[in-house]
């Protein structure tokens, strides 16, 4: 089973759109084929692992943020466990 990291959020003015898009991708990936890690970047640039089971949650709406988060202290080390990275980010405006 491939381990995929979906990265969303970030410092952009379109932060909320990235959150909605990232959560949609997490919810729709085939969990029989992929182990999915949802990785959220807040508006200050801090990285978090999303501990919420996004696949079983209602759709995130614009302006909402994941609630149950664990801060990632060293993103380079953290990403070593991931085989594929899928960034769902916008450039900072």
At which residue positions do the language-model features occur?
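ATP-binding N-terminal substructure of ATP-dependent carboxylate-amine bond-forming enzymes
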Residues: 1-93
């Amino acid at each position: 089973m491939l381990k995929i990291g979906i990265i969303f959020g970030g410092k952009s003015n379109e932060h909320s759109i990235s959150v909605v898009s990232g959560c949609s991708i997490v919810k729709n990936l085939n969990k029989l084929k992929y182990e999915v890690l949802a990785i959220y970047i807040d508006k200050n640039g801090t990285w978090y692992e999303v501990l919420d089971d996004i696949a079983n949650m209602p759709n995130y709406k614009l302006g909402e943020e994941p609630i149950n988060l664990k801060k990632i202290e060293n993103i380079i080390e953290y990403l070593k466990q991931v085989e594929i990275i899928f960034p769902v980010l916008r450039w900072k405006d």
